[in-house]
Amino acid sequence: MLLLLRRAAARAGVPLLRAGPGSPGNAGLSRSEPRARRGRGGEEEEEEDEGCYQLYPGHIPTSPLQKALLAAGSAVMALYDPYRHDMVAVLGETTGCLALPNLRDKMKHHPEGYRILQERPRICLSTLDMSRLRELPDGSLGREYVRFLEDNKVSPDTRMPAKFVDDEELAYVIQRYREVHDMMHTLLGMPTNMLGEVVVKWFEAVQTGLPMCVLGAAFGPVRLSARKLQVLATELVPWAIRSGRNASCILNVYYEQRWEQPVESLREEIGIFPPPAVCV
């Protein structure tokens, strides 16, 4: 178990403390020491490690204890620096064991969501025709999505692939959530500054139930000024919560087939209320 924990943490970029040479159970053995000193138990651990199969490309099998350690470490780092997208991604995967199956079930019971699960579309530069989207009319989803990317200097290729979700279908669900995150900014009319990110996290927390979104919504405001906190509390959070409750599941929209649809029309279809007239 210790060997498995060290390997998963190392691959995830999370450092672990190593016990000293005088610790019980030979816990201080380094990876460079002869394997013979590990005895029969070490061979069994190695066999156990080899028995953890990858469920999809990039998958890192982890135990519940490893997930707990990764969740704790990534939560601390994500709260310290909310723009550490790698830590936010690890936190989402290691704490979404209840929310992700619920989201998958919603997709399976919706015609458009079910088709998305079957076809597995991806939103990245290799699948997007950016030139065509730029030529769409102002106000259309495709044109406003590209405008959001360019105005905020972000790329759809920055979304990290899933690693720690121990189910291939659920791994796609969280990948899809990540790739439509910028679509949520577009539909909600929110920029990528801290205030805009907090508002989107409130909406997503209500929509998805992902603990990572809840933590971002709850602790993100600590970095805001008093004026922005007032706007957030009186205008933006109530609107985000009402919209999140009223809206249908955001993962049940095949956005790639809605590029020509006006943003206002799609908001109305999903159930998102018009954004408040405040400066974000």
Per-segment meaning from a language model:
Residues 1-62:
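N-terminal mitochondrial targeting presequence
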